[in-house]
Structure formats: C-alpha cells, structure tokens
C-alpha cells in the first residue's frame, strides 16, 4: 500500500468539514423538540382530516 492511496479520503472529507462549518454560522437554529412537536401535530392533523373526509 502506498501512502498516496490513503490521502484521497482526507482530502475529500476536508471540503465537507469546511462546508458544514460555514453552514452552521448562517443556519437558523431550531430546537429538535420543536421539530418533533410539529411532526406530531401534523400527524394528528392528518388523522383528523382522514376521519372527517372518509
């Protein structure tokens, strides 16, 4: 095994680290509990609609 074959993984992941680093500074921070509550409420809303329509 040559050392050149292992360097490709590090080079490709370095760009991803830089990309996600810049995304974190500008991203809107939403609490995971808020997302979960929205999903549960949306599911309840869909169930109520399916009961009233059918």
From Swiss-Prot:
Domain of life: Archaea
One Gene Ontology biological process: protein transport
Cited Pfam families: Sec61_beta (PF03911)
InterPro entries xref list: Preprot_translocase_SecG, SecG/Sec61-beta/Sbh
Subcellular location: Cell membrane
Stretches of the chain found on the membrane's Cytoplasmic side: 1-31
TM annotation in the entry: 32-53
Membrane topology per record: Single-pass membrane protein
Family (UniProt): Belongs to the SEC61-beta family.
NCBIfam families: PRK01253.1
Protein name: Preprotein translocase subunit SecG
Highest classification ranks of the organism: Archaea, Methanobacteriati, Methanobacteriota, Stenosarchaea group, Halobacteria
